[in-house]
Each structure stands twice: as C-alpha cells, then as structure tokens.
C-alpha cells in the first residue's frame, strides 16, 4: 500500500498552511522584534501581536498600532526579528 502523502516529511508549503497546533512540530507564530524609530533612530523591543499602541520612549511617536492579530508598524519604521 502506497501513501499519496508523506506524513513524516511534509513540504514547507503545507506546514505553513496548517494550524499552529496541527503541524508536525508545534511552535508559536508570534515573536519579539526590535523596531527602530524613524525620527530619533532609537530601538524599542515590541511583541509582534501587541494589543496596545507602542510609542518611542524618547520622541513619543507611535511605532505600531494594534489590529485584530499582528501589530501594524507605522510607515518608515524598520524592524528586526529577535
């Protein structure tokens, strides 16, 4: 009997489409990131699914705004995944 799908070695495309608990190895899809302010170039650590608006400590500009899921970065801000 030959299986159509290989259950032990799924392709990365099918793993990305599945729910986070239904994958072969469970792992969260959220992460922390360093966000660089566009005005003062100060770096702030932000959670990817932040539920409140995050502002810069020194110049108090808004770095990201919450949405239903992931936080949306303001235009001009760059980020690096930790």
From Swiss-Prot:
Compartment annotation: Cytoplasm
> Bound how, and how many: what does the cofactor note say?
Binds 1 zinc ion per subunit.
Question: Which coarse location class describes where this protein primarily resides?
Answer: cytoplasm
Top-rank taxon, per record: Eukaryota
Keywords carried by this UniProt record = Cytoplasm, Ribonucleoprotein, Ribosomal protein, Zinc
Q: Which cofactor does it need?
A: Zn(2+)
Q: Which GO terms describe its biological process?
A: ribosomal small subunit assembly; translation
Q: Which InterPro entries match?
A: Ribosomal_eS27, Ribosomal_eS27_Zn-bd_dom_sf, Ribosomal_zn-bd
Output one GO MF annotation.
Answer: RNA binding
State a GO cellular component annotated for this protein: cytosolic small ribosomal subunit
Q: Which Pfam families match?
A: Ribosomal_S27e (PF01667)
Which of this chain's residues are annotated to bind Zn(2+)? Answer: 37, 40, 56, 59
**So what family is this one in?**
Belongs to the eukaryotic ribosomal protein eS27 family.
Quaternary structure and partners? Component of the small ribosomal subunit. Mature ribosomes consist of a small (40S) and a large (60S) subunit. The 40S subunit contains about 32 different proteins and 1 molecule of RNA (18S). The 60S subunit contains 45 different proteins and 3 molecules of RNA (25S, 5.8S and 5S).
The free-text function statement in the UniProt record for this protein reads:
Component of the ribosome, a large ribonucleoprotein complex responsible for the synthesis of proteins in the cell. The small ribosomal subunit (SSU) binds messenger RNAs (mRNAs) and translates the encoded message by selecting cognate aminoacyl-transfer RNA (tRNA) molecules. The large subunit (LSU) contains the ribosomal catalytic site termed the peptidyl transferase center (PTC), which catalyzes the formation of peptide bonds, thereby polymerizing the amino acids delivered by tRNAs into a polypeptide chain.
Q: What is this protein called?
A: Small ribosomal subunit protein eS27
């Amino acid at each position: 009997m030959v299986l159509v799908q290989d259950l032990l070695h799924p392709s990365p495309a099918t793993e990305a489409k599945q729910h986070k608990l239904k994958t072969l190895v469970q792992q969260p899809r959220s992460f922390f990131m360093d966000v660089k302010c566009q005005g003062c170039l100060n770096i702030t650590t932000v959670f990817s699914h932040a539920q409140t608006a995050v502002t810069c400590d020194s110049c108090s500009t808004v770095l990201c705004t919450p949405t239903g899921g992931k936080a949306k970065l303001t235009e001009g801000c760059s980020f690096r995944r930790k």
